[in-house]
Amino acid sequence: MTQMQTIIDGSHRTAKSKARDVYRHPIETLSFFGVSKNSSVVEITPGRGWYTEILAPLLKDKGSLVTVIYDANLTKVPYLQKLNKLYKNKLANDKKTYGRVKILEIAHMKPDFKTKKSVDFVLTFRNVHNWAKSGTIDKMFDSFYKSLSTGGVLGVVEHRANAGTSLEQQIKSGYMTENYVKQIAKSAGFRFVSSSEINANPLDRKNHRNGVWTLLPNQRGLSEPEKELYRKIGESDRMTLKFIKN
């Protein structure tokens, strides 16, 4: 059994977290980006820490992990304030797993940052639509570029819209086009390297009345019978893109 598989099977992860592995393919995704136990990694806006559960133990002995979250004092959004507290508590309550994780707090609407030391990887999972909606996406990608070493990798996983979808509809639905993400990354100075279909889901038709949030894990606005139908689809169809800082 590989180290990463041992971590994924670990008792520090809840059954709820493990149930999402089948949709998120963490071993394949991190391997595609090139992350190893020796890597220095920045994880951007990790939410409740699903990927932190895997990255922190993987990197704690020979690598390093910085997670970038929104400063609760610099946002007026209650959800983000709550998320800040939940995430910090998660890390504080399990020092064995998360004791070496460093947290960098940034302003929600002015996310201009640079890590103290340049890193090998910047990773972001299912976040691009949020930055497009808030109008902060250019600043975020510029900050990624500043934080990476030359030759460093930006790894992006995001809900994938059909090609040609308008930006307005992308923001409304939570699904972004690959072309949009590639253009944003290119404008920040990144070179696109490759893509993977690891996180593709052909069952997702992307025409749900509540956008991507209709699907697991949110299932927003669904009746119980509808939830059962949508569980058969699984989580969203996702792009997995790899960029390099020249």
Protein language model regions, located:
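A short acidic, Gly/Pro-enriched loop at the edge of an enzyme's catalytic core
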Residues: 98, 112-122
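A short, conserved alpha-helix within the catalytic core of class I
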Residues: 105-109, 130-143
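Conserved beta-strand signature within the Rossmann-like core of class I S-adenosyl-L-methionine
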Residues: 65-68, 151-159
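S-adenosyl-L-methionine
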Residues: 79-111
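A short glycine-rich, Lys/Arg-flanked "PGG" loop and its adjoining helix->strand segment in the class I
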Residues: 56-57, 137-150
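Conserved class I S-adenosyl-L-methionine
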Residues: 37-47
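Class I SAM-dependent methyltransferase Rossmann-like catalytic core
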Residues: 3-37
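Core SAM-dependent methyltransferase catalytic element
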Residues: 205-246
